[in-house]
Amino acid sequence: MVLSVVEFSFLMDTAREIERFCHLIYQKQFVAAQDGNISARLPDGSVMCTPTRCNKGFAKADDMIVIDMKGNKLRGERKPSSEIAMHLLIYEMRPDIKAVVHAHPAHATAYAAAGIPLNKALISEVVLALGCIPLTQYGTPGTSELTDSLKPFIPNYDALLLANHGVVT
């Protein structure tokens, strides 16, 4: 498939933006090495995402891949993240969502591991920006068990604590 100059430019801009956020979440220590993943919905309905085993601190725009909503690779050299099904489910259930970030920030992951949802107004900034952040049931990463645990929450929440795992926004 041949892209127009405008389409190619948009893809590269999106890839550079994902690269920038990969570096940011790495610098902020929200991920270590190959943890986490980022994706963005493209105007044609496809999804650009970080590949599997991608160190976010060294991610490059050229590393990004494009998949369809079934997870089939359309562009790129590497395989999609092993947790891409989580991203695709969110895009499917929430047409308003344009990007998904899954990370393991220490404090959020500690709450998730302790089984404590962020459902009280402890920090006003969090309440104003995200509202309540519920805790999902544990699901093994990369399996339908994980995506199934998210389904009840996706329609009503913009951030989720993943039990014993991390966070997705």
Which functions belong to the PLM regions below?
Residues M1-V5:
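Short, low-complexity, charge-dense intrinsically disordered segments
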Residues V6-T169:
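Glycine-rich flexible loops
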